């Protein structure tokens, strides 16, 4: 029920029952790989030595590794590509405008760099005259550091995307703005759009943002059609894993990975192609890119973050994390129901670009259309909307046609906001 503050005990019971079933089912899955074709194969190009070294320098681009400390102590890794391969000056002959590119859920900045150089968004924008920055949110492989906590401690994972809104994005924006002295173009994909919408709605970063491009925009998830995600959300799987003491949600190893396999078996889903199962039928991926993606992703997040996303699916609203009871919510928020994020409060003069796909199982067309309706009072000359009929969720980050279909339009949009 929308606005509910209680986690029904019957639902927790269902989740625990599901987990018990999963545990009993694991022996039947031992011979199958969680992530399809990579099972048993050696990894290809990985970012073990850092994203710059593994995936930017090899293409002939300059790249800098930066560390940023959030107000709550997390040390986030960022990459900066300060210029294009040819070292050309900015398009207007002046200073290069900074662009922050923010990845989605269960991946990191490497997800933007899986194709040949001329198909990778960060490198395309650098060649177009922008100062490109890539963020890596807390919990991903190069942002698993903290001033006094470590990933083996439960407290390290005590966060949701609320903290990405309150701490991670502001730290990245402040760092970029402090070094460049310029307003920042923001580009998000999937969860990267959600935390952008939430942050801009609370007006925290609007003085530093020049424009925003949202690919596969996610805010409302009630029509999500990815079967594996829907099952996980509606059976309270994340809540149950939290109860059983697994604060880190790591799809690639341990029990979480086993549970994903068990969901596939129970629901009759062919998870050999897990990318399509989760994201929709992508039109424009090639096999080598998918293999490289699966060699590097998915990345960890917190189980609490997955609970928050599951709440968004079930409650059909965009609210802060629900602590499960009126008393606990009052303790955290001063009210029984978690505060809502009011997307319509995003400043109407902020230039926005949306691109969404007709086959996306996560950013479903109905949910995106409902999201766009929240901008009905936005300045009409500041709204730019692109619908790509045959695109699904992953096409926007590694589709072989994305440069011509989406990225060139993004670059043109950013240049118009100079």
Swiss-Prot record:
One term of GO molecular function: triacylglycerol lipase activity
Q: Which key words tag this protein in UniProt?
A: Glycoprotein, Hydrolase, Lipid degradation, Lipid metabolism, Secreted, Signal
Q: Which InterPro entries match?
A: AB_hydrolase_fold, AB_hydrolase_lipase, Lipase_euk
Secretion signal, residue range per the UniProt entry? 1-31
User: According to its UniProt record, where is this protein located?
Assistant: Secreted
What residues make up the catalytic site? 190, 360, 393
* Biological process annotations from GO: defense response to insect; lipid catabolic process
Question: What SUPFAM superfamilies does this protein map onto?
Answer: alpha/beta-Hydrolases
One cellular-component annotation, GO: extracellular region
- Positions of glycan attachment: 158, 286, 342
Catalytic function, reaction form: a triacylglycerol + H2O = a diacylglycerol + a fatty acid + H(+)
Q: What class of enzyme is it?
A: hydrolase
Q: What is its EC number?
A: 3.1.1.3
UniProt keyword annotation of Signal present: yes
- Similarity section: Belongs to the AB hydrolase superfamily. Lipase family.
User: What is this protein's function per UniProt?
Assistant: Triacylglycerol (TAG) lipase. May be involved for TAG storage breakdown during seed germination.
Q: What is this protein called?
A: Triacylglycerol lipase 2
The organism's taxonomic lineage, starting at the top: Eukaryota, Viridiplantae, Streptophyta, Embryophyta, Tracheophyta
The protein's gene is named LIP2
């Amino acid at each position: 029920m929308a606005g509910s503050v209680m986690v029904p005990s019957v639902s927790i019971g269902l989740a625990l029952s599901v987990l018990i079933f999963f545990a009993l089912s694991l022996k039947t899955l031992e011979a199958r790989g969680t992530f399809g074709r990579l099972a048993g194969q050696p990894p290809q190009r990985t970012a073990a030595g850092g994203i710059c070294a593994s995936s930017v320098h090899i293409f002939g681009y300059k790249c800098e590794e930066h560390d940023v400390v959030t107000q709550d102590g997390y040390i986030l890794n960022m990459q900066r590509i300060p210029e294009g391969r040819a070292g050309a000056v900015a398009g207007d002959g002046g200073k290069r405008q900074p662009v922050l590119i923010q990845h989605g859920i269960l991946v990191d900045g490497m997800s933007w760099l899986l194709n040949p150089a001329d198909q990778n968004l960060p490198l395309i924008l650098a060649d177009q005259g922008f100062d490109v920055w890539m963020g890596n949110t807390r919990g991903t492989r190069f942002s698993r550091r903290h001033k006094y906590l470590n990933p083996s401690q439960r407290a390290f994972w005590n966060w949701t995307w609320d903290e990405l809104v309150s701490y991670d994005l502001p730290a990245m924006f402040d760092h970029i703005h402090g070094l460049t002295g310029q307003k920042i173009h923001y580009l998000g994909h999937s969860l990267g759009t959600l935390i952008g919408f939430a942050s801009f709605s609370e007006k925290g970063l609007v003085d530093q943002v020049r424009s925003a491009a949202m690919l596969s925009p996610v805010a409302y998830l009630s029509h999500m059609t990815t079967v594996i995600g829907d099952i996980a959300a509606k059976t309270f799987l994340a809540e149950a894993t939290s109860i059983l003491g697994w604060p880190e949600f790591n799809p690639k190893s341990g029990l979480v990975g086993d549970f994903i396999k068990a969901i596939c078996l129970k629901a009759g889903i062919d998870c050999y192609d897990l990318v399509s199962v989760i994201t929709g039928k992508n039109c424009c991926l090639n096999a080598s890119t998918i293999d490289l993606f699966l060699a590097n992703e998915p990345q960890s997040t917190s189980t609490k973050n997955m609970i928050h996303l599951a709440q968004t699916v079930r409650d059909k609203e965009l609210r802060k994390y629900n602590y499960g009871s009126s008393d606990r919510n009052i303790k955290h928020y001063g009210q029984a129901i978690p505060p809502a994020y009011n997307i319509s409060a995003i400043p109407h003069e902020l230039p926005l670009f949306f691109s969404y796909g007709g086959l996306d199982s996560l950013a479903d067309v109905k949910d995106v259309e409902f999201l766009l309706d929240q901008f009905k009072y936005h300045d009409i000359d500041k709204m730019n909307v692109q619908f790509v009929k045959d695109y699904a969720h992953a096409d926007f980050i590694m589709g072989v046609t994305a440069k011509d279909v989406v990225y060139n339009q993004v670059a043109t949009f950013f240049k118009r906001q100079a």
